Structures are given as structure tokens and as C-alpha cells.
């Protein structure tokens, strides 16, 4: 007895994905959208531009899933084989669609091009398939039910085209088919200064919840907790999330710095704006990483004045006015020099706050007293200075140390504001 088809799966097509030449952002985006729509999503796959293996993947999906979403392989080149392979899998002929052909000609004409044989291929669709229009590109997709209880939706691999087609046509179609049962909502909380294991231990009872669910994961110093709830309506799902979020924030205390799209940099910038204050940075081992994190956010210039990458001791002296005797006595990687750098940045750039980072990022340059992974941080503000020392160790390498240092510098400032 065969198992009834259920749920949805995503199949991303392209040899470039298998080779790691590009990241598979389409699968992630579609998975999030399916979750928000309340459509059960059980599997994801990646297959190269090979018709035999693609056909095997399609038939496997047809044996177990109600809905297959394919991205990629709809272009005009010979290795774009998605449509042809789908038709062959189910023994259906391709037919040239006059409406698709006219749309292709119009789009190419607007770009000063004529319709060639390669583009004409994009007007060939399986008999009985519904066109899934592409408002921004030339490659149309299809909505096709080749077997009772099994539907395929195809999209180009270009993310902007795929997203426009999904939102404008696919989602309304899915809703009309009553495939959308209720809705999911999620909330992502961000924590800094805790390990994933320690936070998971602190919130252990909440990790056992079923609706909403709470799932932890870590990313270079930051720990995230995603709360996901299902409800008949968005408001009911959000109502289920609210008390759990409140409890997680209470447990996390000052380690919880934001939610959803917040970052340490965005939170710090907002804190500075609310106080009508400004910031300057002085960096050594991070090489501009703190400034880069801040300027990655549009509009940061209203509070972030700038910074000095003081890698050499001479620059620390000349631009930040760190005393030469202090450098000789304490060394560049020290609490005293970090404090002098923060004060120098604040004074020289005329800001309300100064942040400094100096450390040994490795792999060389360490000593018994100042090993690789030792980093000193300082924040200078209207009411004085604060200092933080971290010993990251050398197991994970230079980039890891520098990345954590950027986060710890911003977090130290956040806690002072």
C-alpha cells in the first residue's frame, strides 16, 4: 500500500550550486515563505544540470509530496533543461505557447534585441501547464499538475525574478487551492556573551514546548533563539509567541540585545540616536571591522563620526596621542593602551563616545604573557572609561578572533549606553 502524498519539497537545480560557486539563498527564502503560509515543508534537494538525475529527483518527489517547487534551469542555454525534463518524466509533449512567445518578443524588443532560437525555447511548455508569468525576466515558470494530487511550480534561479513570481502569482494560487492551513509566525531573539550550551540550559523547559517551539543556534559569538508558532490567524500565532518571548528576555537579561533584524551595530546606533550622542572608534587588530559593521547600516553617519585604524604604534602616538612611554611600559596590547586609544578617539574626533580594540589576532605575535587571542577593549564616555579583557585562544584562527572582537567591542559600548 503506497503512502499518501503530503507536504511540499523544494528542488534547486544548477551545477553551480553543487560546486559551491553560489549560495543557495532561494531554498532558504522559499522555506521561510512556506512556513509563514502554513504549508508543511519536509524536504529540500539540490541537483545539477543533468537530465537523468533531475528526472530521478522529480519522480521521487512525485511519489511522496503534494507540491514540488523547482528553481533554476529555465534559461535559454542548452544546459537549462528543467522544463524538458519535467515533460519527459510524465510523458507529455512540449508545445510552443503563442502568448509566451509574444511576451518574450516584447521584452527583448524593449531591450533592443530580437528573438533568437535560444530564447524561443523558453516558450515551449508542457501541454496542459499553466503559465507562471515572469514580470522582470524572460523565463516564465509553470504551474502544472501532471498527476492527480501532485503539482509542480517552476521558477528561474535568479532570486529577484523568483521572488516576484512567487509573491505575485504563486502565493495567490496556493491560497486559492486551500493549501494554506493557518499561518506560522516566528520571532528571532539575539544574545551576546553566552555560549549556546549555557543559554540552552537556562531555557531548557521552554525548549520542550510544541507550539510555540523554541530552537537555539549559534553564529560566531552570538546565540539566537527562534520562537515559532502556528495559529489559525497571524494574530493568534503572535499571541502564542508573546509570553514565551517575554520569559526568554527575562532569563537572558542584559545578554539579550535585540530581535529579528537587529544587530549589535544597529542597536548601538539606535541607542546613540536616542541620546543624541556620537561615536568614534580606534582599532588595531580588528583593522576597521567595528567601523565597517557600523557603516554597513544606512544612515549611520548621523551618529558615527569615523575611526582610526591605528595598527602601528607610531599611528597610535601621532593620531590618537597615546603616550610613547605608556606604549613602552605596558605594550600595545594592554588595558592602559586600549583606554588611551578610546580616549584619544573621543578627543581627536570630537565624539561623545570612543571605542578601542587592541589585541593579538595571530597566528604569530603572541608570547607567554600576551598569547594569541588576548584582546583588550575600552569605552570612553562622558562619565569615564570602562575596560574589558578577552582571551579567545588560538584554536579557531585569526578571522574568528577578529570577528568576536568586533562583537565584543560593540557589546561593551551597548552595555554602557
UniProtKB/Swiss-Prot annotation:
InterPro entries: CinA, CinA-like_C, CinA_C, CinA_KH, Competence-induced_CinA, MoaB/Mog-like_dom_sf, MoaB/Mog_dom. Belongs to the CinA family. This is CinA-like protein.
Amino acid at each position: 500500500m503506497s503512502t499518501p502524498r503530503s507536504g511540499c519539497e523544494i528542488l534547486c537545480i544548477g551545477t553551480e550550486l553543487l560546486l559551491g560557486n553560489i549560495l543557495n539563498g532561494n531554498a532558504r527564502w522559499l522555506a521561510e515563505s512556506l512556513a509563514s503560509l502554513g504549508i508543511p515543508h519536509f524536504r529540500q534537494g539540490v541537483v545539477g544540470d543533468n537530465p537523468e538525475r533531475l528526472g530521478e529527483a522529480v519522480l521521487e518527489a512525485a511519489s511522496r509530496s503534494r507540491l514540488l517547487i523547482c528553481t533554476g534551469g529555465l534559461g535559454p542555454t542548452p544546459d537549462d533543461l528543467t522544463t524538458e525534463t519535467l515533460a519527459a518524466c510524465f510523458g507529455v509533449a512540449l508545445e510552443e505557447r503563442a502568448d509566451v512567445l509574444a511576451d518574450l518578443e516584447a521584452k527583448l524588443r524593449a531591450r533592443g534585441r530580437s528573438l533568437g532560437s535560444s530564447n524561443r525555447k523558453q516558450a515551449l511548455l508542457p501541454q496542459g501547464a499553466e503559465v507562471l508569468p515572469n514580470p522582470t525576466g524572460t523565463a516564465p515558470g509553470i504551474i502544472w499538475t501532471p498527476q492527480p494530487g501532485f503539482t509542480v511550480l517552476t521558477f528561474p534561479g535568479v532570486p529577484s525574478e523568483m521572488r516576484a513570481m512567487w509573491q505575485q502569482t504563486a502565493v495567490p494560487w496556493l491560497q486559492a487551492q486551500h493549501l494554506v492551513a493557518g499561518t506560522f509566525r516566528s520571532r528571532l531573539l539575539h544574545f551576546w556573551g553566552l555560549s549556546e550550551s549555557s543559554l540552552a540550559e537556562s531555557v531548557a523547559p521552554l525548549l520542550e514546548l510544541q507550539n510555540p517551539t523554541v530552537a537555539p543556534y549559534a553564529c560566531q559569538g552570538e546565540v539566537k533563539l527562534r520562537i515559532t508558532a502556528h495559529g489559525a490567524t497571524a494574530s493568534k500565532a503572535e499571541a502564542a509567541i508573546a509570553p514565551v518571548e517575554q520569559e526568554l528576555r527575562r532569563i537572558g537579561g542584559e545578554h539579550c540585545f535585540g530581535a529579528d533584524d537587529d544587530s549589535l551595530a544597529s542597536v548601538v546606533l539606535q541607542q546613540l540616536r536616542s541620546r543624541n550622542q556620537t561615536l568614534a572608534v580606534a582599532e588595531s587588530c580588528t583593522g576597521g571591522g567595528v567601523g565597517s559593521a557600523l557603516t554597513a547600516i544606512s544612515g549611520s553617519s548621523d551618529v558615527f563620526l569615523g575611526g582610526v585604524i591605528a595598527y602601528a604604534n607610531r599611528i597610535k602616538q601621532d593620531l590618537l596621542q597615546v603616550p610613547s612611554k605608556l606604549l613602552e611600559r605596558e605594550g600595545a596590547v594592554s588595558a592602559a593602551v586600549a583606554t588611551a586609544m578610546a580616549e584619544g578617539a573621543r578627543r581627536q574626533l570630537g565624539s561623545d563616545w570612543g571605542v578601542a580594540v587592541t589585541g593579538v589576532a595571530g597566528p604569530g605575535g603572541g608570547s607567554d604573557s600576551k598569547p594569541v587571542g588576548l584582546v583588550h577593549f575600552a569605552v570612553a564616555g562622558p562619565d569615564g572609561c570602562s575596560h574589558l579583557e578577552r582571551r579567545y585562544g588560538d584554536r579557531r584562527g585569526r578571522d574568528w578572533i577578529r570577528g568576536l572582537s568586533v562583537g565584543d567591542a560593540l557589546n561593551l559600548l551597548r552595555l554602557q549606553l
